[in-house]
């Protein structure tokens, strides 16, 4: 899988996977260039999670500890396109973790999902730094029992398809292993 480690990163990379599949760790290593032991480069982390309970606060603290202090962190649960514009000023690779929590936040805020996704895709057009997105693949499991659960699963599937269409590289993580699903050559 030598081509997965090729740098520079393509303009847009999407890292998908289930819970605890290794997607965040892999995406962090892609963004910093440290996937195969290289010295990490600076990067910007856009966090979409909100610490609404103790378990989520613990997860956020674990992610921060793993990343260390070299990252510039922008916390934005809803306005992802605006956060990308803020991150552009740093001129460094950007990691967005994760689209799934962003979608959940949008649904709870009763935002227009199509409009928010359109805004995100438009923000990527001509963006000046590589962007790595993390998203959950929620459509491989059981059918959710509730209408809201099914609506979320369907919306997540549509968002993932839209972002995969936009992405130059798509990686599916399973059991900590990357499976390259799409790899458009990096434009020089």
Regions from the PLM with identified roles:
Residues 1-11, 93, 116-119:
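SAM-dependent methyltransferases
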Residues 2, 9, 13-86:
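Conserved P-loop
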Residues 27, 63, 95, 136, ...:
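Residue-level signal for inorganic ion chemistry
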Residues 37-38, 86-89, 124-127, 164:
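Conserved catalytic network of the ASCE P-loop NTPase/AAA+ motor domain
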Residues 43, 94, 169-172:
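Short, well-ordered beta-strand core segments
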Residues 66-115:
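Helix-adjacent hinge/juxtasegments
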């Amino acid at each position: 899988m030598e081509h997965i480690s090729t740098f520079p990163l393509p303009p847009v990379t999407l890292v998908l996977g289930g819970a605890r599949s290794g997607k965040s760790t892999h995406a962090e290593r892609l963004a910093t260039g440290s996937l195969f032991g290289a010295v990490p480069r600076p990067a910007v982390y856009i966090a979409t999670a909100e610490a609404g309970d103790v378990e989520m606060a613990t997860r956020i603290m674990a992610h921060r500890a793993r990343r260390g202090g070299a990252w510039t962190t922008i916390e934005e649960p809803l306005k992802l396109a605006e956060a990308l514009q803020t991150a552009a000023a740093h001129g460094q690779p950007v990691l967005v973790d994760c689209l799934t929590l962003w979608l959940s936040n949008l649904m709870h805020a009763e935002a227009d999902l199509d409009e928010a996704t359109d805004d995100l895709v438009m923000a990527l057009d001509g963006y000046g730094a590589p962007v790595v997105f993390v998203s959950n693949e929620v459509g491989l499991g059981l059918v959710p029992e509730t209408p809201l659960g099914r609506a979320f699963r369907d919306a997540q599937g549509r968002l993932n398809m839209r972002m995969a269409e936009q992405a130059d590289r798509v990686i599916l993580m399973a059991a900590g292993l990357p499976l390259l699903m799409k790899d458009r050559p990096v434009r020089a």
